[in-house]
Amino acid sequence: RKQYLTMRLFFYLLSPFGLRLGYVFCDLITLVALALNTEIVKISKININIAYSSKNKEYRESLLKRSIKQSIRSYYETLFCLSRSQKILNKSIFKVENRFLYSQTNRDFGLILLSAHNRSVDLLLNQLTTQEDVTAIFKPIKIKALNEYVRKNRQKSGSSVFETNFTGVKELFSALKRGEAVAMAADQVPAKNMGVYENFFGRKVYTTNLIPSLHSKTKAPIVSLAIHSDSLTK
């Protein structure tokens, strides 16, 4: 209990502001990161140049700035999510577009919830689990105390979380067969020998084929989910 409270305080100190003011803080960090040409900037620039090679330099530079801004906001959202009460987190979601998931409470089939991972997966998962229990898999964090804290937070609403391995995949199939919902991020890196190499923008990339496999074997519908904050109030 003491360790849990210590970890929660640690994450709170790293995200002392509400999301609205926190985004302003994140945007200032973005300017610093761009000015210093940090590692995240270098990697994002390489990826954008590959994916948008046909676009002009001005377009790619603009996209780079927006990408870094979204990434840093995502980090802050995760820290915020890991240190706030459920009441505060519920107030952070201002609007839900297309309430399909909310209308599927009485069903006899499973659902595959697929996140584009454009923002914080933890904040999105937290919102989902206020509606129903969700089974999800995640790559374990190397620091044991941090890993246990994050796992407990993701399970606090009654949802099940398993590591990205054969056991975790088996649990996803079982949950779908029971008519429950499972959640995954589109860019989730599979464990060794559990993924495939596919061509992305002319390059071989190690990625997951679990999502189409889950769908083909269970016929569970795939629901795409994402978080957006087009302004400081969202």
Regions found by a protein language model. Give the residues of each.
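Membrane-anchoring hydrophobic helices of lipid-metabolizing enzymes
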Residues: R1-S115, N147-K152, K156-G158
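Soluble catalytic domains of membrane acyltransferases
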Residues: L82-K234
